[in-house]
A protein has these predicted regions:
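Secretory/periplasmic and organellar redox-cofactor proteins
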Residues: 3-187
Length: 187
């Protein structure tokens, strides 16, 4: 229910005619972004499933992985709400969640394609570190913009900051599970 609810809420923000305050993309841009949101949701679901499988298939870990995948979209929808109701002066909040998910989806597989064990370690760990940095920068940058908005209300800033901390803890826990699984596979 949460999965579908967030997806529908996000699409609602992006349908033509409702997105001018959100991303300043008129007309067909809303349709394109809605399609990207759906595709990103599928990628996030696959990413969460793969992460839970690597971590042992535990249902609790799967839920944690799913929350980590959808956390960015949930916060992003919150940013859209802040923009819509005039709680911040930002007019454009970009998101790299889709690109970040694709990058992270490829990282665990890197450990199995390198021809040499030492090469696999360097490649997988190096790419994983780079992907995490890229993912964090692209996903948290929009929230940072809202935090620094001159008209952003203090209560909204506090809520965003708390959500950032919670999301970071969830994603660190998920990332460590994937890291441990890849390390076990390499050794």
């Amino acid at each position: 229910g949460i999965y579908l609810g967030v997806l529908l809420a996000f699409i609602w923000y992006l349908v033509p005619g409702r997105n001018r305050v959100f991303l300043a993309y008129p007309g067909r841009g809303g349709v394109v972004l809605a399609g990207a949101a759906v595709l990103a949701g599928v990628v996030d679901f696959a990413l969460a499933y793969a992460g839970s499988a690597l971590a042992g298939g535990n249902e609790v870990r799967f839920v944690i992985s799913l929350l980590a995948g959808w956390g960015g979209w949930i916060l992003y929808a919150g940013c859209a709400t802040a923009l819509r109701w005039g709680w911040t002066d930002e007019r454009k909040v970009p998101s790299g969640h889709f690109a970040g998910s694709l990058v992270l989806l490829m990282v665990p597989g890197l450990a199995f394609v390198s021809p040499a064990p030492w090469g696999a370690r360097v490649l997988s760990y190096g790419m994983m570190a780079g992907a995490v940095v890229l993912y964090a920068a692209l996903n948290y940058l929009p929230l940072a913009l809202l935090l620094h908005g001159r008209r952003t209300r203090p209560l909204i800033k506090a809520a965003i900051a708390a959500a950032l901390v919670a999301l970071a803890l969830i994603e660190i826990r998920w990332g460590y599970g994937v890291y441990a699984a890849v390390r076990r596979a390499l050794t």
